[in-house]
């Protein structure tokens, strides 16, 4: 039952889920998905990235829609890749997507997989995550690698916008969305202060006290990482978290240099 400490068995690739154990839950948060930066994007890997998101969401939503006692709210992950490569255009929660990139198409399908619940009594929240910064790994770990060898610098021309958010704000914003019945639909989970790639690497270099004078040319990134470099490093997505702010969410880490200092243990502060 919903009060049990046991896990709920499911295997999305086979369309299997223990539906009975989902009865009576107050809320479900769905964050499953293959790491988009885990491997170079072969055709097979892109299929895994897409299917791990879309197929699992379709299975969960179909199951929830058939429950006798469904949850009050379902929070389903998405990503700001939904918007595509948009230059310096400011993108709020209601901005239209681009269908020109793999990540945008994937995110659109990912969100469309929740459509079955649109007219139900389940409150549906689609959290579009930005670049998540965590001391445990992920994007920040990869971004630190060149700095460890004093090779840090901008990627491409450095003018592309990176919309970032700390792991603490991810967790807190998820809790905020779960507890606030007025929030539904797409929610941008990003810091209110997006920055350019050049600004990001300069902030990181400042915190690490390392130089940022060795750029990574775009053509080199594309040669090494292919399409993945284009979409993850060189595309520009300037996103604002209007819905969170309008509903009163207060970011714990709104300023990049302060956030990096805390994450990298350089500030003497930490979050409880």
Predicted regions and their residues:
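NAD(P)H-binding glycine-rich loop region in Rossmannoid oxidoreductase-like domains
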Residues: 2-59
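Catalytic helix-loop patch of NAD(P)-dependent Rossmann-fold dehydrogenases
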Residues: 51, 55, 87-126
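Conserved Rossmann-fold NAD(P)-dependent oxidoreductase catalytic core, especially the SDR/UDP-sugar
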Residues: 58-101
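Glycine/proline-rich active-site loop of Rossmann-fold NAD(P)-dependent oxidoreductases
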Residues: 108, 120, 133-142, 177-187
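NAD(P)-dependent short-chain dehydrogenase/reductase
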Residues: 115-126, 130-162, 204
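Alpha-helical substrate-binding/gating segment
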Residues: 144-152, 160-195
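Mid/C-terminal beta-alpha module of Rossmann-like enzyme folds, strongest
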Residues: 180-227, 261-272
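C-terminal amphipathic/interface module of NAD(P)-dependent oxidoreductases
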Residues: 231-272
